[in-house]
């Protein structure tokens, strides 16, 4: 299962639809709290995080995922409109598998 955390409804629905229609089961979450609730109940095979989110930014979520024994092995991709080299380096340095 792929978990996508994206607060923009249009982007979230488009990506979840595309992944599901490609044979990749996916579930989208608007808020980090919704994501964490589901993650406690069921493991993810891949996590895709937006950086700019309500409640908590994606980089903080990434940091929390990397220090947790249950989730540190799950691949994480960062998804954002912020595309500067600096932002990419920060995301990858914090443990993202792709940006």
Regions found by a protein language model. Name each.
Residues 1-99:
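N-terminal/domain-start alpha-helical segments
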């Amino acid at each position: 299962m792929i978990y996508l955390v994206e607060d923009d409804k249009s982007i979230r629905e488009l990506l979840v639809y595309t992944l599901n229609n490609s044979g990749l089961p996916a579930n989208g979450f608007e808020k980090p709290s919704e994501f964490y609730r589901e993650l406690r109940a069921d493991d993810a095979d891949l996590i895709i995080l937006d950086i700019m989110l309500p409640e908590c930014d994606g980089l903080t979520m990434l940091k929390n995922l990397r220090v947790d024994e249950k989730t540190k092995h799950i691949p994480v991709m960062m998804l954002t409109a912020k595309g500067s080299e600096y932002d990419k380096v920060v995301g990858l340095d914090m443990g993202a598998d792709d940006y």
